[in-house]
Amino acid sequence: MKRTEIKTLKKASGITLHVRAMLFLLAILLAACNPAPDNTLEGKVTPEEAKSIAREAFLWGMHPVGIYHWRHVYSQNAGINRIYWSRKPMKAFPRMATTPNATTLYGTAMLDLSEEPVVIVIPEITNLYWSVQMVDNYARWWHMIGSQFNAPGTVKRLLIGPDWRGSLPDGFVGADIVKSPSNFSGALVRIALTDDTEEELQLVNSIQDRITLMTLSQWEASGRKEVKAEDMPITPANYPTYPGMDTISTQGRLKGMDFMRWVSLVLNDPSFTKQEDGYKEINALARFERIGLKAGTSFDPSLLAPEIKLAIEEGIEEGRKDAMALADKGTGVNRNGWDFSNDLRYKDTDWEQRAFYGLIALLAPIPSRSHTGSFCMKDSEGNPLSGKHKYTITFNLDDMPPVSEFWEMPLYDKEGYFYDNPLDRYSLNSFMLERGKLHTENGKLVIYVQHDKPSDPKQLQNWLPAPEDGFQFAARFYGAYTPIIDGSYNMPGVVRVD
């Protein structure tokens, strides 16, 4: 063979080896960029680890997911930065939120503070309980105004987001300017309805019409005048969704992969501002990535192996079961079956406790502010409440719940919604007692709780209809005094009488 041929052959061989090396390297890079479906999106995880992480994700996510669902339901009707008014007391349908009350008219607004502040103006309201509560994406009540907190006269607030850096308008000073911990905030307005007459309803409706809530730019454009909610334009909500959200009536029913999708929505919504100093949360979110929950990435169940998917579903159900176990353990002070959520026992980082409240009463006033509540799911003997039985709750008239405003005794089905009944009666309250609409005898008020309509007219007057199966109470105390707040008030038990 000639020398030139040998050189050519060597050169060709070198090129071939070089090409092969390049192809091999390219194959490695492509494999790294497009890995085959693994049992996680973020590295290996065992079924046991996946189950544990999913349980933690449920406990952490129950409240944010509930708030996300709440915002979705309301913003479909009213958009954002606009009040949606309930012009009549809430009934069993439509279902807008768990454990509502039937003694106040609600106003609900979903605020997006990422672009500009929101203005809220409340005209002077006399001789009537009212409050406006601001709640963040963790269901924490971060600001309140109302008849218990403010002097008589007009009350206004400029609500600004955590990242807003604009110029403050004149006319707002000191306490008028409030910074939200999150770009999202829910605003919940309550105005007491002291009677069920048409005159009382019209009075409260007229007050609703004079309450203004709008963005700062809209307020300036209106000449800083009152504008009815019905005259405000509807600004559609713009946040992540996934197909099927509209068919989900309650976040409490979410199972397995659906719950994971909702947690993914929460993590990918920039308006849901996370805690900057939440050490526990930061570590938990890092763990969530191992089962596909990560900001910047939509949760995709198809990337999970069957055994990992099953483990996640089991972990979520375990978290739900552990949270609901607090119904037996209690979260505060137990008084004859009533669980008074003592503020001293409340911890913002106790996710199991928070998940419990998220499941039974998403917007529960815990810890107490303008009002507080007490939950009851069992009778005085410790047995689950059921419409198959009859019960009584007996108050001594000289030892009624100590409040400055009013108390209310609502009854809910086992999922936390009003029970649809022929009387449209969902609660009894202190206004009814004061107006003589409840029967009292021998210094006592006896409430009759049962599914069947009582034949005795006196019992019928004090009847609180219950569903055929399980039910629960979430008593409300507006303007609660110390015995309610610390749990020392001796609340009468729910006594089975059949």
Regions found by a protein language model. Give the residues of each.
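Bacterial N-terminal signal peptides that target proteins for export
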Residues: 3-22
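C-terminal motif of bacterial Sec signal peptides marking the signal peptidase cleavage site
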Residues: 29-32
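A compositional/structural signature for long, glycine/proline-rich flexible linkers
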Residues: 34-498
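Short, compositionally stereotyped local motifs that mark structural "simplifiers"
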Residues: 25-26
